[in-house]
């Protein structure tokens, strides 16, 4: 599993060294947007927390232009497309309700501090996240991906809705300003299903075996639901690097 702050190059980038602390040219062109790949699963509570912290960090740094790319990671790649009863999943994943309750209690407490309401008791099914990831990928064409991701997390973890159900997904898409008919037509097809599985495989090949994971400028990665201050520090490092190497969008 990736370390908390992994400052290695996970993409094939040159081995040029960078000297920090030098003079900055204030007349330099406006920096390109910093590319951030958000590797996540929509059924992962830690991803909900991590994404919330990332977006909160970015909101307080309007000086830092970024381009978000939402990359799927399948924690349950063998999950039936129709999902499974929550009780069966908890037994298979945690070995019983008691262990799950302890874990969920800890996550719920952390969520409260972030303004995230986890209501695990409302969940009746554990869905496959493939179609939800497909919908996010589709929504990115219309600039709605970040909004949709947060809406999907809230629907699943707060409202207990089945985000593997097509009617639920269409309703959530519509609530984010997307056309319900177009969303339904897309989900009814097989479009991007192979792409979701390919992106999941790519993440594993990069050495990512846990989420959330934020890959910044193809050179650095930060794993886990880190505090905003930790995220911000790495973003600043990557932004300085980008000025020297021309790494960006």
List each model region and its residues.
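Extreme N-terminal basic, low-complexity initiation segments
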Residues: 1-11
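Structural alpha/beta surface segment adjacent to cysteine/selenocysteine redox centers
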Residues: 51-159, 245-249
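Generic alpha-helix initiation/capping and coil-helix boundary signal
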Residues: 4-5, 104, 132, 166, ...
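Intrinsically disordered, low-complexity repeat segments enriched in small/polar residues
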Residues: 11-13, 21
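C-terminal cap of thioredoxin/glutaredoxin-like
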Residues: 18-20, 25-32, 38-39, 43, ...
């Amino acid at each position: 599993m990736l370390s908390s702050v992994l400052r290695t190059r996970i993409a094939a980038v040159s081995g040029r060294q960078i000297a920090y602390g030098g003079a900055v040219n204030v007349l330099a062109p406006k920096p390109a947007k910093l590319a951030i790949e958000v590797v996540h699963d929509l059924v992962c509570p830690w991803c909900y927390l991590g994404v919330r912290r990332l977006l909160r960090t970015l909101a307080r740094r309007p000086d830092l232009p970024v381009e978000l790319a939402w990359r799927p990671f399948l924690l349950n790649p063998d999950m039936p497309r129709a999902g499974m009863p929550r009780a069966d999943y908890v037994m298979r994943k945690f070995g019983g309700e008691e262990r799950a309750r302890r874990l969920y209690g800890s996550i719920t407490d952390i969520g409260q501090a972030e303004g995230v309401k986890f209501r695990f008791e409302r969940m009746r099914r554990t869905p496959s996240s493939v179609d939800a990831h497909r919908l996010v990928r589709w929504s990115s064409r219309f600039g709605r991906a970040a909004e949709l991701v947060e809406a999907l997390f809230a629907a699943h973890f707060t409202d207990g809705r089945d985000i593997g159900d097509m009617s639920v997904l269409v309703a959530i898409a519509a609530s984010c300003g997307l056309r319900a008919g177009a969303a339904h037509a897309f989900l009814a097809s097989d479009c991007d299903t192979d792409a979701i599985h390919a992106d999941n495989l790519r993440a594993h090949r990069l050495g990512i075996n846990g989420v959330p994971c934020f890959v910044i400028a193809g050179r650095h990665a930060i794993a886990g639901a880190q505090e905003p201050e930790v995220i911000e520090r790495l973003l600043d490092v990557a932004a300085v690097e980008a000025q020297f190497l021309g790494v960006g969008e």
